[in-house]
């Protein structure tokens, strides 16, 4: 447990907070690792089988109906639990092939990231995208190499791959013994102990550790002569040629501690969690329009990074997820809201274990809480007491896929419009309208194709509105930030279209990069942006 001043004080509560996101490529085992962290914390007693989700228990962090049907994480869940004196907030990001803006936004609320890598596949495309977002924020990144119970790449090759592809050096905290399907366990470099591999009851409950000192005369027999000799050679090579552990570099995001294990069998999960909590940082200062705001600033402040409607069909409600940046949150407190520039009362605050909720009396920097949203909150809104500070708006990432959507049943038009607007405000989709055309026809833009399927599913199940969808050829949207003439007088290629976004800002939809260049060359003084602020 961290050294803390007075229990219950702002400083003490902040010091024991850890807020992190798990990032990975699809099928690296992210939801499984999340489940196992909850298992070891005591938050759940048995872990649901992710692969056998239709017939077995559903994973705790996958709560939306479509996720349970497909066995994937579509939205980002926020979960809180206690372990060894720490208060932990996990942000579980989508792990399917077509991820959405939700994935990027969650990283804005995290203080550190756990990068999950499949031992057999190494660094993959989606991991690279998410890693870049983490590097931009300079947050600490911890690496867990998963699926060691199967044949995988040589660990030295994985380290080299991380440095060449991601540009970050790795320092193994433990080291695998056997990577060709003959996995025997890991060697913990800091304690000089070998933890022998035990698969337990297929990972449903906690595994009791079996540790053997490196100098134990029984070890060669336990591992076999070949693996024992290889381990001793690799330890020597690591000590001579490997990067030494430097906590300062880790906390700057310049060196990643590397762990090996098997989340599905629980092996290596507890040692990873223990060391992660020791090495990671408590909530840091956040930049605002009035300068840096330290976490222990007595004035309360936070920002909205996610909005989710209908998390529980029984409630039919809408929740805004807020990351607390400073001060103490208390139930029923009155705060200044940047979106309306008014004082509002925060009622019914909640914390989560996926879709299970608990009422919140108090919360501290680093915590994620859900606020009942009557329709006033927007992504990027700031909430605070004292000085009227604003945190940077969460950027709108340019969608890459577009479709024209309309209601099949004209009598359900009201539900259709309400559903599309609400999903747009959540950030699940982006909407665009052509000039002179009303809500009868809306252009929807998404970062990943699966979001179209999510849109159809949610409109049908939550709003009883079925839609007609026609794929459009556009692949780019650009926001007009400066124009030399009236918008309607701009010269555009025949395949490009003018439109307005949900905040009535002018945009151009393009089919290809050539059309973008043509527009810029034929309209001197025209300036286009790839992203837009949600505050503007």
Q: Predicted regions span which residues?
A:
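Structural and coupling elements of P-loop NTPases
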Residues: 1-536
């Amino acid at each position: 447990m961290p050294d803390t001043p007075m229990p219950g004080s702002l400083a003490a509560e902040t010091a024991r907070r850890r807020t992190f996101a798990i990032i990975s490529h699809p099928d690296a085992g992210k939801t499984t690792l999340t489940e196992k962290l909850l298992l070891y914390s005591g938050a759940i007693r048995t872990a649901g089988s992710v692969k056998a989700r239709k017939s077995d228990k559903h994973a705790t962090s996958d709560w939306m109906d479509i996720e349970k049907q497909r066995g994937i994480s579509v939205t980002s869940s926020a979960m809180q639990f206690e372990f060894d004196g720490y208060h932990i907030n996990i942000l579980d990001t989508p792990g399917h092939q077509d991820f959405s803006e939700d994935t990027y936004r969650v990283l804005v609320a995290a203080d550190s990231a756990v990068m999950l890598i499949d031992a057999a596949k190494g660094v993959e495309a989606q991991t690279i995208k998410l890693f870049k977002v983490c590097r931009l924020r300079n947050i600490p990144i911890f690496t867990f190499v998963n699926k060691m119970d199967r044949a995988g790449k040589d660990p030295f090759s994985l380290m080299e791959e991380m440095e060449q592809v991601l540009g970050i050096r790795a320092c193994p905290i433990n080291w695998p013994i056997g990577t060709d399907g003959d996995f025997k366990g890991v060697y913990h470099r800091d304690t000089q102990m070998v933890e022998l591999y035990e698969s337990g009851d297929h990972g449903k409950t906690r595994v009791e550790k079996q540790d053997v000192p490196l100098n134990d005369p029984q070890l060669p027999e336990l591992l076999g002569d070949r693996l024992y000799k290889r381990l001793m050679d690799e330890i020597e090579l690591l000590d001579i040629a490997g990067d030494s552990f430097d906590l300062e570099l880790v906390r700057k995001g310049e060196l990643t501690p590397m762990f090996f294990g098997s989340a599905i069998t629980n092996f290596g999960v507890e040692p990873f969690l223990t060391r992660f909590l020791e090495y990671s940082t408590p909530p840091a200062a956040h930049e605002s329009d009035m300068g840096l705001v330290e976490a222990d600033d007595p004035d309360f402040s936070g920002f909205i990074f996610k909005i989710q409607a209908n998390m529980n069909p029984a409630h039919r409600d809408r929740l805004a997820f807020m990351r607390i940046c400073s001060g103490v949150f208390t139930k029923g407190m009155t705060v200044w809201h940047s979106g309306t520039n008014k004082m509002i009362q925060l009622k019914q605050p909640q914390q989560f274990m996926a879709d299970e909720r608990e009422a919140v009396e108090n919360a501290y920097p680093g915590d994620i809480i859900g606020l009942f949203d009557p329709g006033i909150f927007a992504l990027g809104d700031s909430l605070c007491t004292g000085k009227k500070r604003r945190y940077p708006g969460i950027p709108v990432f340019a969608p890459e896929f577009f479709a024209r959507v309309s209601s099949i049943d004209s009598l359900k038009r009201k539900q259709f419009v309400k559903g599309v607007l609400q999903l747009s405000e959540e950030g699940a989709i982006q909407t665009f309208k052509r000039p002179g055309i009303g809500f009868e026809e809306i252009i929807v833009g998404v970062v990943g194709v699966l979001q179209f399927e999510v849109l159809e599913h949610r409109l049908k199940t939550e709003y009883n509105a079925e839609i007609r969808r026609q794929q459009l050829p556009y692949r780019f949207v650009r926001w007009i930030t400066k124009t030399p003439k009236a918008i309607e007088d701009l010269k555009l290629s025949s395949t490009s279209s003018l439109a307005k976004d949900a905040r009535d800002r002018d945009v151009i939809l393009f089919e290809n990069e050539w059309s973008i260049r043509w527009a810029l060359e034929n309209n001197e003084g025209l300036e286009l942006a790839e992203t837009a602020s949600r505050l503007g």
